[in-house]
A protein has these predicted regions:
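Short, Lys/Arg-rich, polar N-terminal cytosolic tail immediately upstream
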Residues: 1-10
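Membrane-interface starts of transmembrane alpha-helices
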Residues: 9, 42-58, 152-164, 207, ...
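Alpha-helical transmembrane segments in multi-pass membrane proteins
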Residues: 15-69, 83-93, 117-122, 126, ...
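Aromatic-anchored segments of alpha-helical transmembrane domains
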Residues: 22-29, 94-102, 165-174, 216-227
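Structural signal for the C-terminal ends of transmembrane alpha-helices
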Residues: 65-73, 101-104, 203, 254-264
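Membrane-interface helix/loop boundary segments of multi-pass membrane proteins
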Residues: 136-163, 200-207
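Functionally important transmembrane alpha-helices
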Residues: 184-241
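C-terminal membrane module of polytopic membrane proteins
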Residues: 216-277
Length: 277
């Protein structure tokens, strides 16, 4: 049924995949809390990022099931350009991540000691699991489906990138339950632009683990002080976003245009031509 829906109504298929993914995250969050309350009986003793990992593991499972049931599980093993060559393609976001991490650690560290090592480990694991789950779904399931629908022409690749970015941005509306509305709206704009760039990197490399690495590194960097020192939560961080986040449209779409310049589109055909109908 999923394979037929994907073939005949690809955009509806993408919407169904996203809704089920987000729904599973919500259910997994509730079940994790109930399990912890039953076993530990003290929710304050449990690290928030441990809960994130448990939640995102359920998301990974949903995305993998969509890939497996539609015959696309092999995407997770596809080498494409290779991981390290792919990192060169994604050098721009990696440079941004490195700069932000350096700037944060140099100028943004609060007074006081870091959290215990086990908290930091859960922070790294939790944020990495977000990157894995979201890349499996938004690039492996959604961007891949849209590319196969629109084709590997220049217009087709751009449509797949932009539309998958919009799906990615819209998913962050779920943060309205815990963060300020303006912050969430700005996060959606930021995420839509970033999702467009990550789709371009995925299409240029044919290797989903490249975007998993970039996404996880970006999430870790964005919460670096909170994760190392416990000074803020993800919800607190989102609430601080303001209209300056609109600059992300240019920050991410200009390099997207560079990655998808005409002479490089043959690489998309090389890695994904076999998937076209």
């Amino acid at each position: 049924m999923l394979k037929r829906l994907r073939s005949t109504h690809p955009m509806l298929y993408c919407l169904v995949a996203e809704v089920l993914f987000l729904g599973m995250l919500f259910v997994a969050s509730l079940l994790s809390l109930l399990l912890i309350l039953f076993v530990v009986r003290d929710i304050d003793a449990v690290d928030d990022y441990m809960l994130t990992f448990m939640q995102e593991t359920a998301g990974v499972l949903v995305a993998w099931l969509f890939l497996a049931r539609t015959g696309k599980g092999g995407l997770l093993r596809r080498r494409g350009s290779g991981f390290f060559n792919g990192l060169l393609v994604g050098l721009y976001p990696i440079a941004l991540i490195s700069y932000n991490a350096y700037n944060t650690l140099l100028f943004g560290r609060p007074e006081g000691d870091m959290l215990p090592a086990w908290h930091v480990v859960w922070f790294l694991i939790g944020m990495t699991s977000v990157g894995v789950a979201e890349e499996f779904l938004f690039r492996g399931v959604i961007a891949q489906t849209l590319l196969e629908h629109f084709g590997t022409s220049r217009a087709g690749v751009w449509k797949a990138c932009l539309l998958s970015g919009l799906y990615f941005g819209a998913a962050h509306l779920t943060n309205l339950t815990g963060s300020a509305p303006l912050g969430v709206l700005m996060q959606c704009v930021f995420a839509a632009s970033l999702g467009t760039l990550l789709a371009a990197v995925y299409f240029r490399t044919g290797n989903i683990w490249v975007t998993v690495f970039i996404h996880a590194a970006m999430d870790i960097t964005s919460m670096l002080i909170g994760g190392l020192y416990g000074t803020e939560t993800v919800a607190d961080s989102i609430s601080t976003y303001d209209i300056t986040m609109l600059t992300s449209i240019a920050v991410y779409l200009i390099p997207t245009a560079f990655l998808l310049r005409k002479k490089k589109l043959s690489e998309v055909e090389l890695y994904f031509g076999r998937d076209m109908k």
